[in-house]
Regions:
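Active-site core of metal-dependent hydrolases
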Residues: 50, 120, 145, 188, ...
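Acidic, glycine-enriched loop/beta-strand segments at the rims
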Residues: 26-27, 40-52, 64-65, 368-376, ...
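Polyanionic/metal-chelating signatures
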Residues: 130, 135-287, 414
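His/Asp/Glu-enriched, well-ordered alpha-helical/loop segment
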Residues: 99-100, 105-117, 262, 303, ...
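Divalent metal-coordination and catalytic microenvironments
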Residues: 38, 53, 58, 80, ...
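Histidine-rich, glycine-flanked metal-binding segment
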Residues: 27, 31, 40, 44-84
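Bacterial N-terminal signal peptides
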Residues: 8-19
Length: 446
């Protein structure tokens, strides 16, 4: 009993300290900032030299050259620096996965092939160590996508759940959330005669006939779910609430079949992309293509159907052995030339911090710099329907901003100031802590 009382007393003291610390940190933040002297890249208009951005209550209150600085503003002198919108990673598992090899820290996918009722926001860990590492490179907001973990990005079943957009700062998801559901995630089935089994670390082969049967079965099941969702919506609209039995899975699919919620279809090979586009067309679904390693082969189709692409990491090998080695790096410029909207993404957790590197690599392979910047900011916001909140520096938008000492797509550039939802946010992180720790280690005597 004495031990229990002592434990409870210690717990209460610790919790009280935590609450005081949290309150102190919140209270210490002013609600008004003025960033002056920077070269402002709004991405909504021309570059503003020696401009001023005023932030009030989490949003951009004013931007321009002849802007009055409020008397209650905390002024940040950014002369000689660059000011950009915060970067946006639209397909990641940040907050859903901590250590890939420790299953207790992985909450990317659920058992079963059809889980439309799952929402990524409910599983995001706001205290993930990956969050400060990622935002230190200028990424201020992301979309957590369920069911896209692993080497083949097919770990979450056919319908993996709903993707959620949120900021990379905050105590809880209520603090961080931008939009709870931005897309329904569908891992498009593929006719695979050869696959890698991680349990035996070997390849498994099957006949084309068997692989085709599995593919047809998955597509038919997906079609059946959508048909049932339409019937469910009709029954709910016309039936008596007292007699109506609620089904969360079908209820979650209703916005999809009504065209209110897009489907993020993960597919890479040309055949799979074509099949997915045809299927979504027949079902009248609003499609976004995710990964799209061979999207360059079907640009005319994507443009005709007005389907945007969220590219996976471009520093990768092509899907086919006879494809030019640099095709993943040149694909962004080809999509641009074809008029297909696209954005970059990391498709991971620890590599979300490398998002600006992917865009920089695309610039080296022919993509114009301004288009690369749009592909890590406003493009994804437009694709997922949240461009009214993030993506550019405009009055009334959320103040997710980065102040850098150079081009954010250059590896050596550093983020000097980081604002998320109008709050000056620390760029300290575990990587930097370890760097400082070992940089200061005692030197051996010579």
């Amino acid at each position: 009993m004495r031990f229990a009382k002592a434990f409870l007393l210690t717990l209460y003291v610790a919790l009280g300290f935590f609450e005081l610390t949290a309150a102190a940190q919140t209270a210490a933040q002013p609600s008004v900032y003025a960033i002056k002297g920077a070269k402002i890249h709004t991405l909504a208009g021309p570059v503003i030299d020696n401009g001023i951005v005023v932030i009030r209550d989490g949003k951009v209150a004013a931007v321009g050259v002849s802007v009055s600085i409020p008397s209650d503003a905390q002024v940040i002198d950014a002369v000689g620096m660059e000011l950009y919108p915060g970067l946006f990673d639209p397909i990641t598992q940040i907050g859903l996965e901590e250590i890939a090899q420790v299953s207790a820290t992985v909450d990317v996918s659920e058992l079963g092939d059809f889980n439309p009722e799952l929402v990524a926001a409910t599983a995001v860990n706001p205290a993930s160590a990956h969050i400060p590492v990622t935002r230190a490179n200028g990424v201020t907001h992301v979309i957590a996508v369920p069911g896209t973990s692993g080497f083949d990005s097919q770990g979450g079943g056919t319908i993996a759940g709903q993707a959620s957009a949120f900021n990379l700062a905050g105590w809880t998801m209520d603090d961080m959330q931008i939009q709870r559901s931005v897309a329904m995630v569908v891992n498009w089935p593929s006719i695979q005669t050869r696959s890698f089994d991680f349990s035996t670390f070997s390849f498994k082969e099957k006949s084309y006939e068997d692989a085709k049967k599995e593919y047809d079965k998955s597509v038919n099941e997906l079609s059946d779910w959508l048909t049932r969702a339409r019937h469910y919506a009709q029954a709910k609209e016309k039936g008596s609430p007292a007699l109506f039995e609620r089904d969360l899975k079908l209820e979650s699919l209703v916005p999809v079949v009504q065209g209110k919620l897009p489907v993020l279809v993960i597919a890479d090979e040309e055949r799979d992309i074509k099949n997915a586009v045809e299927f979504c067309g027949k079902q009248n679904l609003k499609m976004i293509l995710g990964s799209g390693a061979e999207a360059w082969k079907v640009t005319a189709l994507l443009k005709e159907k007005k389907i945007p692409v969220i590219l996976g990491p471009i520093e990768r090998l092509p899907e086919q052995e006879d494809t030019p080695y640099d095709k993943p790096m040149t694909q962004p410029s080809e999509l641009l030339a074809a008029g297909v909207p696209f954005a970059f993404s990391s498709f991971g957790t620890s590599f979300s911090r490398r998002l600006p590197d992917y865009a920089g690599t695309a610039v080296a392979y022919g993509l114009p710099h301004d288009e690369a910047m749009k592909a890590v900011t406003i493009n994804a916001a437009q694709i997922f329907g949240i461009a009214d909140q993030v993506g550019t520096i405009e009055t009334g938008k959320m103040a997710n901003l980065i102040v850098t000492n150079g081009d954010p797509l250059e590896v050596q550039t550093q983020v000097k100031y980081l604002f998320i939802k109008g709050q000056l946010t620390s760029t300290d992180n575990r990587h930097r802590d370890l760097y400082e720790q070992y940089r200061k280690r005692p030197q051996a005597a010579h």
